[in-house]
Curated annotation (Swiss-Prot):
Belongs to the GHMP kinase family. IspE subfamily. Pathway: Isoprenoid biosynthesis; isopentenyl diphosphate biosynthesis via DXP pathway; isopentenyl diphosphate from 1-deoxy-D-xylulose 5-phosphate: step 3/6. It comes from the Bacteria. This is 4-diphosphocytidyl-2-C-methyl-D-erythritol kinase. Keywords: ATP-binding, Isoprene biosynthesis, Kinase, Nucleotide-binding, Transferase. One of its GO terms (molecular function) is 4-(cytidine 5'-diphospho)-2-C-methyl-D-erythritol kinase activity. The gene is ispE. Its EC number is 2.7.1.148. It catalyses: 4-CDP-2-C-methyl-D-erythritol + ATP = 4-CDP-2-C-methyl-D-erythritol 2-phosphate + ADP + H(+). PANTHER family: 4-DIPHOSPHOCYTIDYL-2-C-METHYL-D-ERYTHRITOL KINASE, CHLOROPLASTIC. The active site is at K11, D136. One of its GO terms (biological process) is isopentenyl diphosphate biosynthetic process, methylerythritol 4-phosphate pathway.
Length: 286
């Protein structure tokens, strides 16, 4: 049985400003997404009977509610294909960590199955379908670091520096709904007028609320903050700090390992998923 194995990379919100709240309850954001060379891995095998089967169950997530299954079925339905797939997940990224695990898995599923099912779908169409699954899915479908506006779906490619990061993973899952509904959340940051998007003098507007409500996150920020500027990604719980070399990042993580769990990863403006897909295209055309 031939299988297609692809990564589902993590992302960081290098900063995140909330500039308003819409009538439908969603928040207007401005943020910069950058990928990490670290993530989940998914394997896909073609089925002729139309069945979508995820062989790796995730605790507390019913099979039919999993974003991987939902993405596969939505693509199947909208494309009209009679084909199905067996799917296996190697889960590395934490749930509720703010590094995009579920959204990235969904995007990898869309791109993988469009390839396996030989669908004539371009990136725009896959990204639009991805948006119906979650606001962060389109950036993973497109695979380029981006300045995002709206609810996070209006994407402009950017190329920030690509440092090494220490990412700490507090052993707590932060509820995005809880954070975005919190009365003390800043919702009136001024929209950016500058282009290109500045990299300095920024923040994550969710961070004060998360720090206040999740002491594990506050402790991680304080620990990493002794070595570099530490910041929350997304609504958390993961926090990150940048370093100029892998050696320095590894050293800091080792110093924190007695009290913190985390990993070191390279920032990347082109996702490792897209680099892998590009290599597959080159092989098939060679």
């Amino acid at each position: 049985m031939h299988t297609l194995t692809l990564p589902a990379p993590a992302k960081l919100n290098l900063w995140l400003h909330i500039i308003g709240r819409r009538a439908d309850g969603y928040h207007e954001l401005e943020t910069v997404f950058q990928f990490l060379d670290h993530g989940d891995e998914l394997s896909f095998a073609l089925r002729e009977d139309g069945v979508i089967r995820l062989h790796t169950e995730i605790e507390a997530v019913p099979h039919d509610s999993n974003l991987i299954v939902r993405a596969a079925r939505k693509l199947q339905e909208q494309s009209g294909t009679a084909l199905g797939a067996d799917i296996w997940l190697t889960k590395v990224l934490p749930m509720g960590g703010g590094i995009g695990g579920g959204s990235s898995d969904a995007a990898t599923t869309l791109l993988a199955l469009a390839h396996l099912w030989q669908l004539d779908w371009d990136e725009d169409r896959l990204a639009a379908l991805g948006l119906s699954l979650g606001a962060d899915v389109p950036v993973f479908v497109r695979g380029h670091a981006a300045f995002a506006q709206g609810v996070g779906e209006q994407l402009t490619p950017v190329d920030p520096i690509e440092p090494w990061y220490v990412v700490l993973v507090p052993q707590v899952s932060v509820s995005t709904v809880e954070i975005f509904s919190h009365p003390q959340l800043t919702r009136d940051s001024l929209p950016l007028k500058m282009r290109p998007v500045p990299e300095g003098n920024s923040r994550n507007d969710c961070q004060p609320v998360v720090e206040q409500n999740y002491p594990e996150v506050r402790n991680a920020l304080n620990s990493l903050g002794k070595f570099t500027e530490a910041r929350l990604t997304g609504t958390g719980s993961c926090v990150f700090g940048a370093f100029p070399s892998k050696a320095e990042a590894d050293k800091v993580l080792a110093l924190l390992s007695a009290t913190q769990t985390g990993f070191v990863a390279k920032g990347s403006n082109i996702s490792m998923l897209h680099r892998k897909l590009q290599s597959l295209v080159k092989k098939s055309s060679a």
